[in-house]
Amino acid sequence: MTAYLLAGGGTAGHVNPLLAVADRLRRDDPAAEVLVLGTAEGLEARLVPARGYELATIPRLPFPRRPNAAAVRFPGEYRRSVRAVGELIRARGIAAVVGFGGYAAAPAYSAARKAAVPLILHEANARPGLASRLGARYTPWVGVAFEGTRLPHARFVGMPLRPEIEELDRVAARPAALAEFGLAADRPTLLVTGGSLGARRINQTIAARAVRLTEAGWQVLHIQGGRGELSDPGLPHYRLLGYCDRMDLALALADFAVARAGAATLCEFAALGVPAVYVPFPIGNGEQRHNAAGVVAAGGGVLVDDAGFLPAWVDAQLLPLLADRARVAEMAERAASVGVRDGSDRVVALIRTGLSAA
């Protein structure tokens, strides 16, 4: 029996690819032992046990970014976490550590190095995080979701997708999707989503132009997320949801989308051939703009800054684009040309390579 330690978490961007790879490992070898390392505060604390995997936790330990009391405590706390993970590796007979970034990842990478256990990394963002930059120094087996990601030994594997997305047959799922959302079969669908946390700029701008979008012959499936600040105007062909737990069905209908440029969103859209306007999150290290660069360069998406995504931009840019059905169809083909549906298989193949070289 082979035992794997999958390390990472914090956000859905780390947890979902981790779970996709865990599922693939378990499918390929039902006897395999898959243990997940995370923190008690991250999303993994809920999602990992719900999926049937054992979760081991270590303290949430952000890398210090300024000289303060936390920075003084960090080296000792980091060493304690590395020792705890090392003990776990020895006690459970871990054959390989597979990391996906997040707070639990870096101590796992250091522990794998000390234990001389094969380490395999997956970096989901085009601009790698601190944990991946550290871990990539310790291993030649580094998979990345985006071409051109600057990490040593990086090889393009795409994003491990949720099974319901990886296996989605959009044509076959369309009748169920139309029924789920109460939408019309004879209109193209514009999917609008800011993710689970929402995106105020996207929500406000689309709501301000809902009438014009529907008058242009489209129907709008608007998933506002977050705190649900918008009220449903009751317009025909405009469906406003606070949250959607069937994103597979939403994507089955999407002929075009407006969204943030998170790694998972981009990779799911590209894998399914959904063209989009991407409005990167305006705060942070600019990783969402980097994420979108490849699909935009391929012609499968349009990039607009958060501050520029205004009703006037919709009038001048989005509405004419949606009116050009040939361009929308071409953008769909170009998005699909950079999409990857077998990211889970590619990461598992990388794990097998690491094991065989050990």
Curated annotation (Swiss-Prot):
PANTHER family: GLYCOSYLTRANSFERASE, UDP-N-ACETYLGLUCOSAMINE--N-ACETYLMURAMYL-(PENTAPEPTIDE) PYROPHOSPHORYL-UNDECAPRENOL N-ACETYLGLUCOSAMINE TRANSFERASE 1. Keywords: Cell cycle, Cell division, Cell membrane, Cell shape, Cell wall biogenesis/degradation, Glycosyltransferase, Membrane, Peptidoglycan synthesis, Transferase. Cell wall formation. Catalyzes the transfer of a GlcNAc subunit on undecaprenyl-pyrophosphoryl-MurNAc-pentapeptide (lipid intermediate I) to form undecaprenyl-pyrophosphoryl-MurNAc-(pentapeptide)GlcNAc (lipid intermediate II). This is UDP-N-acetylglucosamine--N-acetylmuramyl-(pentapeptide) pyrophosphoryl-undecaprenol N-acetylglucosamine transferase. It catalyses: di-trans,octa-cis-undecaprenyl diphospho-N-acetyl-alpha-D-muramoyl-L-alanyl-D-glutamyl-meso-2,6-diaminopimeloyl-D-alanyl-D-alanine + UDP-N-acetyl-alpha-D-glucosamine = di-trans,octa-cis-undecaprenyl diphospho-[N-acetyl-alpha-D-glucosaminyl-(1->4)]-N-acetyl-alpha-D-muramoyl-L-alanyl-D-glutamyl-meso-2,6-diaminopimeloyl-D-alanyl-D-alanine + UDP + H(+). It is a peripheral membrane protein. Pathway: Cell wall biogenesis; peptidoglycan biosynthesis. UDP-N-acetyl-alpha-D-glucosamine binds at residues 11-13, 125, 162, 196, 288. It comes from Leifsonia xyli subsp. xyli (strain CTCB07). GO terms for molecular function: UDP-N-acetyl-D-glucosamine:N-acetylmuramoyl-L-alanyl-D-glutamyl-meso-2,6-diaminopimelyl-D-alanyl-D-alanine-diphosphoundecaprenol 4-beta-N-acetylglucosaminlytransferase activity; undecaprenyldiphospho-muramoylpentapeptide beta-N-acetylglucosaminyltransferase activity. GO terms for biological process: carbohydrate metabolic process; cell division; cell wall organization; lipid glycosylation; peptidoglycan biosynthetic process; regulation of cell shape. Signal peptide: none annotated. Its main location: membrane. GO terms for cellular component: plasma membrane. Belongs to the glycosyltransferase 28 family. MurG subfamily. Its EC number is 2.4.1.227. It is found in: Cell membrane.
